[in-house]
UniProtKB/Swiss-Prot annotation:
It comes from Bradyrhizobium sp. (strain ANU 289). NodD regulates the expression of the nodABCFE genes which encode other nodulation proteins. NodD is also a negative regulator of its own expression. Binds flavonoids as inducers. Residues 6-63 form the HTH lysR-type domain. Pfam families: HTH_1, LysR_substrate. Signal peptide: none annotated. The gene is nodD. It comes from the Bacteria. Residues 23-42 bind DNA. One of its GO terms (molecular function) is DNA-binding transcription factor activity. InterPro entries: LysR-type_TF, LysR_subst-bd, NodD_PBP2, Tscrpt_reg_HTH_LysR, WH-like_DNA-bd_sf, WH_DNA-bd_sf. This is Nodulation protein D.
Amino acid sequence: MRFKGLDLNLLVALDALMTERNLTAAARKINLSQPAMSAAIARLRSYFRDELFTMRGRELVLTPGAEALAGPVREALLHIQLSIISRDAFDPAQSSRRFRVILSDFMTIVFFRRIVDRIAQEAPAVRFELLPFSDEPSELLRRGEVDFLILPELFMSSAHPKATLFDETLVCVGCPTNKQLSRPLTFEKYNSMGHVTAQFGRALRPNLEEWFLLEHGLKRRIEVVVQGFSLIPPILLDTSRIGTMPLRLARHFEKRMPLQIVEPPLPLPTFTEAVQWPAFHNTDPASIWMRRILLEEASNMASEHREPPTPQARLDSRPRRCKNILINHSTAWPASSF
C-alpha cells in the first residue's frame, strides 16, 4: 500500500532496522530474507534521500536523518496497532496480553506482588515481564518498548501521562546487635557509621536519600553499594553498618529476619510512587484496565498502611514532601531512582 509515494510496508522495515541496528536481526524480526531487507533499505534511501544507515562491523549506525525519523515512525506504527488493528473490546478473562513493567525491587516486593496475585484470579492468561531500571526509562516509554514505568513521581518525565500510587517514607535500618543503635541515632553517629546503600541502573546512579544528602552538601561513608534495596538487610547482618530504605520494605524484612528500624537523625523527604505509561496507550483498553487495577491496589495498600508506626520506628510525623525541596535541575540525576 502506498501513501503519497511511500510504500507503508517500508516503515515496518525501517522501524525494525532502527530498533535492532543489525540487518540480519531486523530481517528475522519481520520475516524477510536478507536480500529483501537490503532491497527495502535501497528503496528507503531513495525515498528519504538520505543514506539512513552506515555499517560499523555488523552494526547499523543511524545517520542524523534516521535518528530524526525513529520516534515518529515508531509512534505511527504503534498508533496504527492500537487504534486500528487492535480495536476489539478487551476481555481480561480471555486475554493473553503481556505487560512489560519497569520497577524497583522495593515496588516488586511490597506492591506488584499484589497485582500478580489479583491478575492470576481475574485474568489468568495475562503475563508480566518485570524489568530492572535502565538509564533512559522515559525513552523506552516513547518507543513503546515498555507498558508501564513505576518510580517516584518526582523523577518522571512530563512527556507521558502518569497517576500517583502512594506516599512512602525512608527509614534507617541496622542489625539488632548493632550497639550503636541502642540509643536514638544522632547525626554525628549517622555520619560516622559505615553505610550500605542501593544504587540503580547500569551506571549505578545514587538513590533518593543519597541525592538529597548531596544536594545539602552532606556526605556519608558508603562502604557497600548494592543493586537494590532488598539486598541491604542481608548485608547488615552481624555488622555495625547502617542502611536507608523505604519503610514498607523495612517492615517486610523485619518480619523475616533480624532487622532494626530506627528514625533517621535528619528529616529525609517522603516521596510519592507513581505509574507512567506511553501517551499513545491512553485509549488502549488493556492499558486502561491495567491502570485501574494498579490504582485500586495502591489505594487498598495505602488504607492498610494507615496505622501507628512501630515503637522502634519512632517516625517523625511532620510532613516532609519531595516537592518542597529545591531541586537543582543541572544535577545529573536518572529517572531511575527507586
